[in-house]
Amino acid sequence: MMPHTGDVVQQKVPAAVYSGHGFVNLTGSTQVNELGNIETPIVLTNTLSVPAAMNGLISYTLAQAGNEKISSVNAVVGETNDGFLNDIRGRHVTEQNVLTAIQSATPNKVIEGAVGAGTGTVCFGFKGGIGSSSRKLPASLGGYTIGVLVQSNFGGVLTINGIAVGAYLQKFSFSNELLNNVDGSCMIIVATDAPLDHRNLMRLAKRAMLGLGRTGGIASNGSGDYVIAFSTAEQNRVLHQTNNLPKPLLNLPNDATSPLFMAAIEATEEAIINSLLAATETIGFKGNKVAALPIQQ
């Protein structure tokens, strides 16, 4: 994911990372929360391909014109463990794969389902994957947009619009000894054009976990559930080269943030459901098979 179309290390974006449950590798998160910004594109992959993804991000950043003197890159890479369907120990993701993904990124509609980092993921016992959703506030509430992208790979009792669909389908975690695996993780990225600083982006990120809960996820012992939130507001970008003088920023007042919180909750919930609706049955490593959510049923 590209925070904007320019060089992110030269124009960093305000950001925050929230850990709903920390059993996952999210590189760069401590610096993001220390400095309050993100300085690279965001890459999602599988657990054992994190080093390759980091190398790809670093190579991409160093190769950009104007970055000849850059000697530190805080690469942001998130992951989930897709070892049931993917030959994860083979570490097939390469640095070139990451570079190709970055170079081919477009502002077009997100391809959802069993694609990219979602190719091998499993969600609520069904095929998971990449999902997205968005909300736009009315002009009376600022007219801001919230966009959410998820990599769904976790368990619980699938719930859609408040209905326990997993229970109805008799397929949910702990229903029998074969369906007791709720581990795997969920990566959630929340982007907004609202002028939020690190503190309010952290508050926004926390609300995304409520959206995960609304789908029936439980943030289990072995599930790493992280939220990366950032603002695209151009006037609040952090320039790499500064004159060390104070810079005026636009910050949305606390009292105006609640509509954004609701939007983040709704969009996260919907993005997770969309990842399931778009995914198709997948046969993977060693013939392991995961069925898609039976939509007609």
Language model features with spans:
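Alpha/propeptide regions of enzymes that mature by internal proteolysis
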Residues: 1-297
